Amino acid sequence: MNLEYGPEYEDFRAEVIDFCKEYEGISFENTSNKNISRSEWQKILIEKGFIARAIPKEYGGFGGETDIIKSRIIATEFSKAKIPGGMGGQGIDMLVPTLLEWGTEEQKQQYIEPTLHGEMIWCQGYSEPNAGSDLASLQTKGELKDGNWVINGQKIWTSTAQYSQMMFCLVRTEPQAPKHSGISFILIPMDTPGIELSLIHISEPTRLHLI
């Protein structure tokens, strides 16, 4: 079995190494002549195809093919050069793939690009006071009234809630269905009337919230 990368991948590795040399010493702090904002850095990485590689251009990605070997080369060379990667977080890592697979075209157009570029921050509304890893036990309920969802319940252990503009949330919308069914994935603006945040006091600097 030949585990060596072919010429195409070695050419790509050379491209990544040259990029890392160009941005050696990059900083997000105002202490370097190579200071750059995180949003600017995110844009550069997307344009080069070093992140969001397989996300279509019409949604703010690079528009390339999925290639696990190139992804490994990028991660390896960035690590060697101590070059920061792109933004992560629950929006980019969890919501964007979900929307690409299951979202409507309107949702894809509205949410994916600003999320990829760090302009829209998301938190995750899964765990509840009585439903942690067993999400089939969740009790937050959603009822459709006059074309809008009315949601009542609590979510807990929610990180980044204080910074987030949006939350993707699991809600029981069919209360008569079996416990593993009747659950909907709903996108909720965090400035929706009725949403309240309560800080859960744990060791700093971690901040989690009850919603």
Task: Cite the ranges covered by each PLM segment.
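Amphipathic, small/basic residue-rich leader segments at the start of a protein or domain
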Residues: 1-89, 106-117, 121
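N-terminal glycine-rich flavin-associated loop
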Residues: 84-106, 132
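Short beta-alpha junctions and helix-cap segments that line functional grooves
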Residues: 111, 138, 156, 198-199
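Active-site-adjacent elements of ketosynthase-type condensing enzymes
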Residues: 130-138
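A structural signal for short hydrophobic beta-strand segments in well-ordered beta-sheet cores
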Residues: 140-143
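A short core secondary-structure module
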Residues: 148, 152-196
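Single conserved hydrophobic/aromatic residue that forms the stacking wall/gate
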Residues: 200-211
